[in-house]
Amino acid sequence: MVRGIGTLNNASPLYIVDGMYMNSIDHINPNDIASIDVLKDASSAAIYGSRAANGVIIVTTKEGSNTEGKPIIDLSVNLGISTASKFLDMLDAKGWAEVTTIARQAIGKPALDMATDLANKPDNDWQDIMFRPALMQNYNLSVKGGGKYSTYYTGLGYFNQDGIVKGTNYQRYNIQSKNDYKRGIFSAGTNLIISFSHDKPLHQELRGGMIGTILQSVPTLEKYDDTREGGYGGTYGDVVNIPHPLAIIDDNIMDRYNENVKIFANLYAQIELFKGLKYKLNLTPDFSFERYKNYLNKYDFGLATNSITQLTERQRRRRNILVENLLTFDRTFGEHKISALAGYTYQDSRFRHIQAYGEGLPQGLEEIDAATTNRSNEGNSWRSVLTSILGRVFYSYQNKYLFTATIRRDGSSKFGKNNRYGYFPSFSLGWNVAEEKFMENVHWLDQLKLRGGYGVLGNQEIDNYQYSSTITTGINYPDGNGGLLQGAFPKNFANPDIKWEETAMTNVGIDFMAFNNRLSLTADYYVKNTKDILLTVPIPISSGGANDPIRNAGKIRNNGFEFNLGWMDQPNPDISYGINLIGSFNKNKVIAMGSESGSIKGGSTNQNITTSETKAGYPIGGYWLISTAGYFNSQEEVDAYAKDGKKIQPAAEPGDIKFVDANNDGVINDDDRVFQGSPFPDFTFALNGNMRYKNFDLSIGLQGVLGNKIYNATRQTLEDVTKGSNFLASCLDYWTPENKNASHPRLTWDDPNRNTRAESDRYLENGSYLRLRSVQLGYTFPQTWFKGAIQHARVYINAENLFTITSYSGYSPDVNADNANYRGFDNFIYPTNRTFMLGLNVTF
C-alpha cells in the first residue's frame, strides 16, 4: 500500500521490471535483483499512466559489465528452517469434554459421544500434529562479464520451500539472460526471464480453509482407522462434519497442485539520430501458462463422507504484448540542462480459461476422459488493449531551480468509445537551496532541497466489458406441455458512461543532508484525492435479477506525512555503522459513495455476517459493530435493562453478554451498530540498524504499526460453543455466579442471547505491534586466505520474525487482505513463519 488506498478496486501497485510491466514480482529470483525503488508522488509516477495511482515499484535486475572478457561467477547457497511463530491455546480432550458437556447440560442434552470415556480415546493436539519444522533451500548461480562493446548476465536459481503445514510445498526454477551491445550511435539488447513453479497449496475450499480445519478438529478424533474407507478416523454424534486433517494432506485422498510457467522478454534497439536526440524501440512480450488439478477420492470420515471420485482440471493462458516507441533528448547549454521524452505505447493483453470436471473415475486413473458421470466443462476469454501517448520535459538552471512537466493520454478498451481516453498531467518544482551563494558559508550543510508537485493519475483496474451488456444462457423454463425451452436473461446491463478513475495528488517535501552526509532526512506531506471511483450501485430486484451495474460514484481522500531519518558514520577504517527510522502517518476518508445511504459491506464471517462497511464520512473498511457492556450478573440486571417496560434482551440470563442499545429503540439489531475503528494504522514504521567491525557485519530490522483494529473472526468461531468442534482454551474461564469476571460468558449449547454474535465488538482487537523482523550476522573472509581463485566469500546466519510484541490474541497481527473491504479481517489466517537461515556467498 503506497500512500494509502485510493480505490475500492485493484489497489496493487504497478511493477516495472527493467521496463517490463508486471502484476507482481513473486516469480522473480531475488538474487537477480540489483535495486528496488518506489515512486510515490504523482509527478514521478505520471509517466507510467494506468495503475500508477496506486504507486509504482521500479525493479532493476543485475546486468553485465566490462570485465575485459573474464567472467565473474557468483554462487549463493541458503539453507533454512521455518516454524510457526505462535500456536493458539486450544482445548485438550479433558477441557473440550468439560466445555461441551456443561454447555449441553444447560439445555438438558447429554454429553457428546466423543466427549465421554476419555480413558479410551486419544488426546490429539492437532496443531502439533499438522504443523512442522519446514525446510527451505535456495541455490543461485550467476555469470556476468563483457568487453568493450557487449556485456552479459546469466542467472540460474532454484528455490524449494516446504510449508509449515504438512503436505504443502512450493518450488520455483528461474533463469535470466541479459545481453547488451553498444557501439557508436547504436545500442541493442535482450532480457529474458523464465520461471517455472510447482505449488501444493493449502486447501481453501474447506470450512475456514485448512487452518480452520486444523483448529476445529476435536482432540478425541482418531488419527487412523483401517476400517474406514481412506484409512482415517471419523467423527460421530452431534459434532461438526469437517474433513480429517491428515486425510486432507494425503495425495491418495485429496491431490491438488498448481503449475505455472512465466516467460518475460524485452528486446530493444536504440540509435542516436543526432547529438542529444535518441530513438528507442522496446518490444516486450510476456506469456504465462497455468495448470491446476484437484482430485478427490472416496473417503469416510464419519460425518464427512464422499462416495464418488471427482476430478477438476483447469488451464489458463495469458499473453501480453507491449510495444514502445520513445524519443529522448538530453542536452546541456551552459548553465541550462534540458531533457525531454516523447513516446507512443501499445499494449495488447489476452486471456483464455478452460476447465473440465468429472466424477466416477476408476481408482488410479486421474484423467477427465475416465470420468463416468457428471462431466462438465467451461471456458471463457477476454482481450484488453491500452494505447498511450506520453511526453515529459525536465529543465534545470544552475542545478538550483528544477522543473518537470509530464502529460500522458491513455486509451483503454475497458471503457466505452465516448470515455475511452483519459488525460493525466503533472508537474513538479524543485529548489536546491544549498547551491545558493548565501549558503556558501554553511559548511556543515551538504544538501537542502525543497520540492513540490501536483499530478493526476488514472486507474482502469476493473473487469473487461463492464460498459457492455452481457447475457446469461442455459436458463430453462417450462413450455406448458411438459417440456423445457432454452432461455436467457441479462447478467449485466450496459453502462457506456463509465470512465477512468482519477487520482489527483499534491506533494511537498524536503531533502536534507549534513555533517559530511552522515545525517540525512527526507520528509513529505501529501494530499491524495481520488474521484470517479468505479462502484457497483444497487438496482431494484424488479430489474430481472441482473447484477448491480458499475458506475463512477465514489470519492476518497488520503493525506499523510512520511519521513526517512538516518545517520551513518565510519569513525575509523575498522568500524562503520548506520541507523535509520522510516515512518508514515496516513488517514483515509470516503467522501462519497454514489448515494447518501450507499455503502460496501465487507469482512464476512463464516455465518455470512458482515463486520465492516465502507461509507461516506468514514475510513475505508471501517468496523461497524454492536457495543458490549459486560455481563448480566443477576436476573435483576436482566429485568432492569428495559425500554418502556419491555426487556431489551428478553432471551438473556445471568452470565450472558449485555449489548448496547445504541439507538435507544428497545431492540438489539443491526441498527445498533456504531463505528468502532479502522483496519488501517495511524502510523507505520520501521527501524533498521547495521554495524561493521573489521570483517564482521550485523544488521537488525524492526517494524510495526500503531492505531489499527483487527476483527478476530478466528476467535469468534473458536469461542462459539453451540457446535461440536474444538474451542479456544479461554472457554474454560466461563461465567458462573462464583466467577463473574470470567473472560467467556456462560456456557450454553443453544445460546438464545447470541453471545457469540459476529456483529459485536467482542472480537475487535487492538492491531498495534512491534516485530523484530530480521537479525543477520555475517563474516567476510579476508582475501589473503585465497590464492586468486576466489575474489570474495561471505558466510552469514539470519533469523526472521524472532518475536512480536502485541496484545492481539490471534496467530499474527499482520492481517492484510488484497481486498480493501477485508483489510484487518482475520478468518483463520496462516501463522507467521519464524525462520533461521544459514547462507554462503562466493564470487570467483
Regions found by a protein language model. Name each.
Residues 18-46:
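Short acidic/polar hinge/loop motifs at secondary-structure boundaries
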Residues 74-121, 466, 568-678, 719, ...:
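Conserved small-residue
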Residues 1, 7-9, 13, 55, ...:
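Residues embedded in well-ordered regular secondary structure
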Residues 676-711:
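Glycine-rich, aromatic-lined ligand/substrate-binding cores of catalytic
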Residues 1-3, 13-18, 35-39, 56-60, ...:
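Soluble periplasmic/extracytoplasmic beta-strand elements of cell-envelope proteins
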Residues 12, 137, 172-173, 178-196, ...:
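Extracellular/periplasmic, surface-exposed regions of secreted and cell-surface proteins
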Residues 116, 127, 412, 705-800:
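Extracytoplasmic gating/loop element in the C-terminal half of outer-membrane beta-barrel translocons
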Residues 8, 22-24, 42-47, 64-67, ...:
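Short beta-strands and strand-coil junctions in structured, solvent-facing domains, enriched
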